[in-house]
Design a protein with these regions (language model features):
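PEST-like low-complexity, intrinsically disordered acidic/proline/serine-rich tracts
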Residues: 2-287
């Protein structure tokens, strides 16, 4: 009978082990499975590839309903799709004067948004525009990010750098690794870029801290902390996923501004015949 008890105990033990292993393999609801990611020769996560945001932050970082666009002749082409907030708490903590300025920007989007004039988009806006961007990790550890929109680019220096000599559209980026997360600090901005088409803006005191964390072979978690003591009452965050483009022939394509932008920027210099209607005044409205 002793050998029978031994068999029974063995069977129970095997069944218990199998049950536990099945429980371990089943991820808890809301838990992201641990997926092995590829790495570079020096052991850092391999972020190389073409990535793109798929949400509506480009139109408005906060919750917003669908609405018609400001240029009536473009119909649905310039319409704004509904979207959910990527801002932590759905609140951008503007100082009172800045909140009024943001409202003015929103109401005068077509004449104020730097994107309309095809200027460089700045950071973090370049990351979540409806165009892909490419990450290239170089042999000397510096990282190049190239954006399809406006053919913009920036080099992320992985070593300590001197303060930026001048303010620029894309700022000066310095990176470091925090475990498997790429952390990028960018300063040295001018005050000419916006965060979206809803008029959210900043000053030249902007400091952007980005965190890129690879969650799976085709998914990056993108978290941004925005600080600007001249405009906001406190730092605030945005967060969204970035997806790897799976097209077999994925690549960044050429970018060209549409022709009416030239009219918007330089139309006042054209010789008038008396028959023209002012572009911004005659054709623009918000609902």
């Amino acid at each position: 009978m002793n050998w029978l008890k031994g068999v029974s105990i063995a069977v129970v033990s095997a069944g218990l082990a199998l049950g536990i292993s099945q429980m371990v393999r089943q991820p808890v609801e809301g838990q992201v499975p641990d997926v092995r990611i590829s790495r570079t020769a020096d052991g850092k996560p391999d972020l190389n590839g073409i990535w793109q945001a798929m949400g509506t932050a480009h139109w408005d970082l906060q919750d917003h309903h669908a609405r018609s666009g400001p240029v009536l002749e473009l119909g649905a082409t310039a319409a704004v799709p509904a979207g959910l907030s990527v801002v932590e708490g759905n609140e951008i903590p503007y100082q009172p004067w800045a909140a009024a300025r943001k409202k003015e920007n929103y109401e005068n989007w077509l004449s104020r948004d730097p994107e309309v004039k095809c200027y460089l988009p700045g950071i973090p806006r370049a990351t979540y525009m409806p165009y892909p961007f490419q990450i290239l990790q170089t042999h000397n550890n510096d990282i190049l990010m190239a954006y399809e929109y406006a053919s913009a680019s920036r080099i992320i220096k992985m070593a300590k750098t001197e303060p930026p000599p001048v303010d620029t559209w894309m700022g000066q980026s310095t990176g470091r690794w925090d475990g498997d997360t790429l952390v990028v600090d960018t300063i040295g901005f001018n005050d000419q870029t916006w965060f979206d088409r809803a008029g959210n803006f900043h000053s030249e005191a902007l400091h952007v801290t980005e965190r890129f964390t690879r969650k799976s072979p085709h998914l990056l978690d993108y978290e941004v902390t925005i600080e600007d003591p001249k405009v906001f009452t406190r730092p605030w965050k945005i967060r969204m996923p970035l997806y790897r483009r799976q097209d077999q022939n994925a690549q960044l394509m050429e970018f060209k501004c549409v022709e009416f932008v030239e009219e918007l920027m330089y139309g006042q210099l054209r010789k008038k015949t008396g028959d023209e209607k002012p572009f911004a005044a005659a054709r623009v409205r918000w609902p």
